[in-house]
Structure formats: structure tokens, C-alpha cells
Amino acid sequence: MNKLIITVLLCCPIIFFSCTNTPWHKEQAEVFLSKGVSLIEAGQFNNALKELMEAEKYSSGDPKIHYYLGIAYIGKGLRDKAVDEFKKAISLKENYSEAHNYLGVLYMDMELWDEAIAEFDKALANDIYDTPSFSLYNSGWAYYSKKDYQHALIQNQKALQRDPGAILRPQIDKNIGLIYLDQANLSEAIRHFNIAVELSPSLYDAQLFLGETYLKIQDKANAKKAFQAVIKYSPQSAYGIKAKEHLQSIK
């Protein structure tokens, strides 16, 4: 009898564990996951975490739950926990491009440029990744931060080729402008800064870079217009303050 009880007790954890994979458990996990995602979209990251942690109890092996846990932790400023969750998501789904991309962004935040680039490359290795322009843009910025301008330009140009109408288009052209500016190719820098501000006039950092580049070629009239745009869209920011200083220096 005692042997039977011991056998049953040893088997119970297996039974209980397997029960968490039932359709009912998956349905419950989806309910909490859906609530968590909605709360993330509303910017309520703490409440989102509560829902997602409940979802994890019902389906701990769902990579999507860990992915959104990572996003919620980012929203709360808990970077290390976010890294752990994205790694869990990837361990459960190796070709999870979105998780690789987010992990790369976190590595960039830590200035781990090579690690970030490796994650973006893994994201891009997935042929059915829906938004490759995001990882290409991020990869370009990581290369730029390393002062590897050749690869930075290649990645940004690929982003434009893959998705010319991307929501990131103004940012991509701004970054290409910065690459050319650092290489003293002022005409190309101005061209790309102009594209960026034409697509998004409120992109005030690009407006400032444009104005400063115009100053380098002594085009004070266009520089003045660019600085005035910075002040219009972001008067109290560091960019706005710098634009005011430039305007005061222009005679």
C-alpha cells in the first residue's frame, strides 16, 4: 500500500504539469495575454505585467507571453528582466524575429553594439519577418555608433529598399544624413536631411542637423529656416535651445 501511495505521489507532478497544456489552460492564457497586450498599448505597464504573469501560469511555454512580458518590463524601466524574458521567448521560438529585434535594442541601450548587431542579424535571417526595416534601421544605428559608416550606410539603404514607404523613412534618411555629415559629404547630408524634414517637418533633431550643415557651407538663409522650424516644434528642448543660440549668432 505504501509503495502504491509513493508511486501515485511521484506521478502526480507529471499529471499536473501535463494538465497545464490542455486547451482550457491555453484559452485562459489567451484571455490574460489579450488583456496584457491591451494594457501595454494603453501604457499601463504595471497592470499589464499582472495580466501577463497570470497568462504565464497557464501557459509558461508560450513564447508570445514572454515576448510581451519583456515589453512590459521595458515600459517599467526594468531592463535586465526584459532581457531575460526576450531570451526566454527566443529559447522557445528560435526564429522569433520581433524578440531578437527587441533584445538587440536593449543591447544598444547598454552600448553592446556587436551583441546588438548579432540579434538584428538573427531577426533578419527569418524570411517571413514582417517588419525587416525595423531591424535594418536598428542595425544601421548600431554600426553608426561603432563608426562603421560603410555598414551603417548599407543597412539603412537596405531598409529603404525593403520598405520605401516605412513609417521609419524620415528617421532612416536622417541617419543617412548623419553618416554623410560625419564623412564631410555635406551635399549628401543636406539632401537626406531635407528628405527627412519634408516627410516629417516636426522631426526637430533633423531640422537642427540640417541647419548646422547649412551653416558649414555658409548658407545662412536656409540655416535660419531650419533653426526656426526647430523652435516651432520643440522650443523648450535641448535642440530648441541650441537652435536659438544659432539664430542669435547669425548676422
State where each predicted segment sits.
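Terminal, low-structured helical/coil segments at or just beyond the last alpha-helical repeat
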Residues: 28, 167, 216-251
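Helix-start (N-cap) detector for alpha-helical repeat units in TPR-like alpha-solenoids
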Residues: 28-30, 63-64, 97-98, 131-133, ...
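Canonical tetratricopeptide repeat
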Residues: 34, 68, 75, 102, ...
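Register position in tetratricopeptide repeats
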Residues: 41-42, 75-76, 109-110, 145, ...
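Structural marker of alpha-solenoid helical repeat scaffolds
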Residues: 24, 58, 92, 126-128, ...
